[in-house]
């Protein structure tokens, strides 16, 4: 899976009230169903495996404490996701269930203990386990009748999958006819379709050159390659298959899991060579550690190891519980670390001129994702110094050419957690942090001050909007959803227009159509008459803009959406705001005092406004833009609404409007929206997933509303 999902709750399950548990159970159920669909149907996971496991762990813990919440369609009772509808459906004769997870050695000991108790074994009875790496690929069931492959189906929701027979026939690891004699009439062989890391990198290079989809990780590329309507596309992709299980069998050719693995090999299948027979908990844990040590060296992704009771008659006695077998478990790996070489360090310049050093890595798989870039934060971080002056990595600095250890803790953004000094080459290069901006202007770089007036760790270019790097980032902000929100003008299009010299400042966006007779945009690759017409219509639709959005779109430092709204409400019109800004820039004490008196406006914002409007270049940008755009007066908050002057906090997931919409509506009706609950809070609007803020509301005696009650209160 891909990126992480931050947990929306902080209350321990043991501390949840029944009402809180019910709300969170519903939210987690919906979230898990969504991620199952993205993973199993669309091959486009939005969170990492570790983050998904954490969600499911919490969900299961809630159901364990409140068993009355469990329902037939609960994610704890189902597997995967329903077939997508792109392929013919196939009913599994024997359901394809998933394994329960173990995250700690204690979980493995509990697993073995449960089996011994269930089978009523004596203390000296030994249980043999077949242990194997857990391949991170796409589960597949292959049905053979009379030794011939007749159907290949994906897992789907465990009961029903998708027919991908034509595509599976293109895999060299899948025999069309089983080898050997005296084969059972019906054999269902199950295993994992995967793509090697090397093949994945090569495929992405070809995809990039062809302008096609770039896959996030080998698992996604394997799934996407297999679920093609055209089998020739699948045939062109280097997919492998490991056999490790079975489904419907008219006769069993072996009495043990390990015996079945050998039989798969005799039939012509590839099995994982690291599979091993273990006879104790200690051997299982040693196997897990050994595989984890080899993980980075393997040419395919794994996310844990699997333990299965070896004796098939014991597997049958143990049976299943809900969606998982009692006889098997997946022992997952912790947040993955990987070693790689830092090839270079590049500087990225942000919209406000902030410098961010980015490490360029030899591509390496971490947590199911190929990582090539890593943020190095700032100059001090590279030197081994933290934001508060603390020592990082025992003071080891980061040099170009170093072997570094990177980690996706919780599988979030990769970070450098260590530098291997013993692997440092003699020619490792100390990174010289630039004192001039890398832009053509080569303007000076300064270190920002902290709130205490001390030198901070963040470096910034002083070129402002004359700096082309800042220009392009400002243009991206200007067209973004929270500013002018111009449909069809995303970051990619802005970059293209900027590189071509067609859009250098915001006003240029509104003159594109006028200049198109010369530009001939419809002749540019990727555009046509219809798309160009749609773009121009979208631009025209933004010729009128709310004052707060306009102020935000100017991109002044420290002026985010909330501050922009406060300024818009404080001055009411563009004319009044513009006049005040010019006076503030000229040091007019009365104007400065008036701005300082506004709600949520302080010295930092005033300095930023003064600096912005004190520059001739910026005033020119604003003047040219206001010739193209009509700026609407700020909407005055309704003072007669039931929430006028009230303080509102939103928490949890809102289902009938986005958080931004709810915030905007509340502010339009005269309320103040806060991010935390205090004695001054009037209402907490709680949706599914509401966590600690509900407890805070109870502590302070604040009224809690559901989303429906909130909408009823405001009359919407």
UniProtKB/Swiss-Prot annotation:
UniProt keyword Plastid, yes or no = no
* Single Gene Ontology MF annotation: metal ion binding
Lineage top rank: taxon: Bacteria
What's the catalysed reaction?
NAD(+) + (deoxyribonucleotide)n-3'-hydroxyl + 5'-phospho-(deoxyribonucleotide)m = (deoxyribonucleotide)n+m + AMP + beta-nicotinamide D-nucleotide
One Gene Ontology term, aspect cellular component: cytosol
Q: Which CDD domains match?
A: BRCT_DNA_ligase_like, LIGANc
Residue ranges of every copy of the BRCT domain listed in the record: 638-716
The record, for PROSITE patterns, names: BRCT (PS50172), DNA_LIGASE_N1 (PS01055)
GO biological process terms held by the UniProt record: DNA repair; DNA replication
Catalytic-site annotation from UniProt: 134
Q: Where does NAD(+) bind?
A: 49-53, 98-99, 132, 155, 192, 308, 332
- What are the binding positions for Zn(2+) in this chain? 437, 439, 461, 467
Keyword field:
DNA damage, DNA repair, DNA replication, Ligase, Magnesium, Manganese, Metal-binding, NAD, Zinc
Which cofactor names does the annotation list? Answer: Mg(2+); Mn(2+)
Bilayer-spanning residue ranges? none
Entry EC no(s)? 6.5.1.2
Q: Which InterPro entries match?
A: BRCT_dom, BRCT_dom_sf, DisA/LigA_HHH, DNA_ligase, DNA_ligase_AS, DNAligase_adenylation, DNAligase_N, NA-bd_OB-fold
Instruction: Cite the Pfam families for this sequence.
Output: BRCT, DNA_ligase_aden, DNA_ligase_OB, HHH_2
Main enzyme class: ligase
NCBIfam families registered for this protein in UniProt: dnlj, PRK07956.1
Family matches, as HAMAP family: DNA_ligase_A
Functionally, this protein is described as follows: DNA ligase that catalyzes the formation of phosphodiester linkages between 5'-phosphoryl and 3'-hydroxyl groups in double-stranded DNA using NAD as a coenzyme and as the energy source for the reaction. It is essential for DNA replication and repair of damaged DNA.
Family from the record: Belongs to the NAD-dependent DNA ligase family. LigA subfamily.
Q: What is this protein called?
A: DNA ligase
Species annotation = Bradyrhizobium sp. (strain ORS 278)
